[in-house]
């Protein structure tokens, strides 16, 4: 829908996409309440607009640009042909936790998923090239991340919202040569989406307001402090869409530490995985006597996280009624 200028949270350049997942026929709104359409594959068209903004407006003054691509979200087989032709299903490996009965379907989906990713690889490369062209690549913070993963038939499951790693783990790449140097390194520490904004403020030398949720990890990123033993809060407030209650969807809260995943639903403890010993999460250790002490520790960590965020963990229907949402039969 059209978003008037006064509700755009300060953004001055605006081309907001309507969420259709029809990547070759998608629309957006700009400064007028007129529906416009992206030409061709929308991720490429959106990248070209971002490049145009950088060339025309960004050089010589600070800017923030937020570019949100739709792919590699389903539907999977809609990337341009030059990318789809690069991936043959029978040549692709699937994860060991994909059931044998789903392996061929998983390979077919992966071929399209990888094609979308290959297209985005080129788009990201084009953005970096434009930053270099304008002479601002070294002094620009670039973050590449995502809002969710995709089960892709691991554990016989599909799509998002679910507490397994294929769904909750997402890439987080941060590039800032002026402060971090030209080389790369890996920080083995879980973070959550609320941590991104305060960390970016820290990297910019801007004080983080006390009201901001999340943690400033800029000193960790710069190598000035060791990575703490952090835990990311994971949750599904109310199942919907592609993970309905009829399909086994449920409310849950959990924590993902560097080593463990612990999740409870409204009925109690649900999942416990040792991701170091069991990276494909094939063995659920929840409620086993020999892991009672570990489970108690993780339960305490989860309760602390919920207290910190003011989450009383009720049925999703309670929140829907409380906030006056209207949902269809799928919970959407």
What are the residue ranges of the model-derived segments?
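Long, internal low-complexity/basic segments
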Residues: 285-332
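WW-domain-binding short linear motifs
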Residues: 228-235, 320
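Short, acidic/polar N-cap/turn motifs at the starts of alpha helices
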Residues: 2, 25, 251-252
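Basic phosphate/pyrophosphate-binding loop/patch that engages nucleotide-derived ligands
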Residues: 6, 58-59, 132, 220-230
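Low-complexity, glycine/alanine/valine/leucine- and proline-rich hydrophobic stretches
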Residues: 247-269
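Short, P/G- and charge-enriched loop/turn segments at secondary-structure junctions
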Residues: 157-162, 240-243, 248-251
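Short, structured coil segments at secondary-structure junctions
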Residues: 9-10, 168
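Active-site-proximal cap/lid insertion segments
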Residues: 17-44, 51-194, 202-211, 264, ...
